[in-house]
C-alpha cells in the first residue's frame, strides 16, 4: 500500500478510500469512529472491541495529537492506517496502562459518520 506523509509528521495509507467529493470534518463536528492500536511490530495493544465505538467533537475534546490530526484527513466511510511517532501518540508518559514510554503506534481508524454542526 502506498504510504503518504502528512504535513503533521506521521505516515498513513488508505485501507478503504471514498470519493473526494465527501467532506472532511470541521471544527465542532461530531465524529463517530472506531480504532485499534498496535505497536510497531503489529502486536495489538488495544483492539477495536477493547476501545469500543468512539464519539469525538472535533477540536473541542481531548484526543492524542496524531489521532486528532489524522481524523481531519478522513471522510465518512474511510478506513485509514496511521503510523504515529511517539510524540504524536502518548509521548514520554505513555497511557499509564499498556502503552509505555516513547512508543510509536500503528492505529487503524474507521470513520463511521460525521455529524456536521449546522448554523442556527
Regions picked out by a protein language model, each given a short descriptive name:
Residues 1-120:
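Cross-family detector of peptidyl-prolyl cis-trans isomerase
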Amino acid at each position: 500500500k502506498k504510504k503518504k506523509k502528512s504535513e503533521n509528521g506521521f505516515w498513513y495509507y488508505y485501507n478503504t478510500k471514498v470519493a473526494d467529493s465527501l467532506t472532511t470534518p470541521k471544527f465542532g463536528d461530531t465524529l463517530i469512529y472506531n480504532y485499534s492500536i498496535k505497536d510497531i511490530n503489529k502486536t495489538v495493544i488495544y483492539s477495536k472491541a477493547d476501545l469500543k465505538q468512539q464519539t469525538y467533537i472535533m477540536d473541542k475534546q481531548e484526543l492524542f495529537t496524531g489521532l486528532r490530526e489524522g481524523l481531519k484527513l478522513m471522510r465518512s466511510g474511510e478506513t485509514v492506517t496511521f503510523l504515529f511517532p511517539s510524540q504524536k501518540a502518548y509521548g514520554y508518559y505513555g497511557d499509564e496502562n499498556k502503552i509505555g514510554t516513547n512508543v510509536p503506534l500503528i492505529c487503524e481508524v474507521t470513520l463511521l459518520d460525521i455529524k456536521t454542526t449546522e448554523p442556527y
